């Protein structure tokens, strides 16, 4: 609690000049859980603002980084108050039972974590999550997304460019990484290849243990319904409790009051 009291809000609740919004834009939504006795943990991904490393757009490296947070919540990993010292901080308030929810990219990472079988993850409620990054951007060898595909989205989500001094330390090396990512991605044109896509296909995971309530908009033309179906089938194949909630909205969270998406 002492560490939390000394934290500064602008480290995680800040205005993004590139998007024109404040992250996290839906922070009040978590009041629903807090009022019901849950603790809420929000974590930046690797390569994002105030973090380290490269943003890798859904790779196994990114998923493993999020898994480390769950391991900390279950007491299986050590964490420190900041990057410079060795003062350990424990999640002694956590009972080790973790659930996840979130939309779009935050729904996608849930699929990735569920596929790892990380201990402590009991259930997920992903909204408009991506099951396979190849199938998000391509369909049987035809590009149906942006030309840059995962390399472009990785750059967009990097976030470290908000801090110009920090960005200067990785700009050249990260540019080289993105170039290699594009080379791998287009090794077979727009056809699938293991080099870029297999570690971003969460349906291939063999560690599924948790339950899932998968939420998907029938009119979502960003993350299409195929993604929800693919992940539903993976949970079913693993013999797990999985349900789907389909609504008539698009790329939205139907419980948010400002979306006005009716649930049939």
Label each region the model flagged.
Residues 235-253:
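Catalytic histidine neighborhood in serine/cysteine hydrolases
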Residues 39-44, 97-102, 107, 122-128, ...:
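Structural recognition of the beta-strand scaffold that forms the well-ordered cores
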Residues 34-50:
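Conserved alpha/beta-hydrolase
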Residues 46-49, 131, 251:
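Alpha/beta-hydrolase active-site loop signature
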Residues 208, 214-216, 220:
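Short beta-strand/loop motif that positions the catalytic acidic residue
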Residues 23, 49-68, 76-80, 256-263:
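Catalytic nucleophile-loop/oxyanion-hole region of alpha/beta-hydrolase
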Residues 221-229:
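Conserved alpha/beta-hydrolase "acid-adjacent" motif
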Residues 2-19, 23-30, 35, 63, ...:
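Accessory cap/linker subdomain of secreted extracellular hydrolases
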């Amino acid at each position: 609690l002492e560490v939390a009291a000394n934290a500064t809000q602008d480290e995680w609740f800040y205005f993004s000049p590139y998007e024109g919004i404040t992250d996290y834009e839906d922070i009040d939504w978590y009041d629903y859980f807090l009022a019901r006795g849950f603790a809420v943990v929000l974590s930046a991904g690797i390569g994002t603002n105030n973090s380290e490393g490269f943003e890798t757009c859904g790779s196994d490296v990114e998923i493993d980084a999020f898994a480390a947070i769950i391991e900390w919540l279950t007491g299986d990993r050590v964490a420190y108050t900041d990057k410079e010292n060795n003062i350990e901080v424990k999640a002694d308030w956590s009972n080790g039972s973790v659930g996840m929810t979130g939309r779009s990219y935050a729904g996608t990472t849930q699929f990735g974590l569920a596929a790892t079988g990380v201990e402590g993850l009991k259930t997920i409620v992903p909204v408009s999550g991506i099951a396979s990054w190849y199938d998000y951007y391509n369909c049987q060898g035809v590009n149906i997304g942006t030309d840059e595909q995962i390399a472009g989205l990785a750059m967009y989500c990097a976030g470290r460019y908000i801090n110009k001094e920090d960005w200067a330390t990785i700009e050249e090396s990260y540019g080289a990484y993105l170039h290699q990512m594009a080379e791998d991605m287009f090794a077979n044109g727009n056809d699938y290849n293991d080099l870029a896509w297999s570690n971003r296909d969460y349906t291939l995971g063999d560690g599924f243990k948790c339950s899932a309530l998968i939420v998907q908009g029938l009119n979502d033309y960003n993350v299409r319904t195929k993604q929800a179906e693919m992940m539903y089938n993976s949970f079913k194949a693993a013999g797990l409790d999985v349900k789907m909630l389909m609504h008539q909205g698009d790329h939205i969270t139907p419980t948010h009051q400002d979306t006005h998406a009716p649930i049939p």
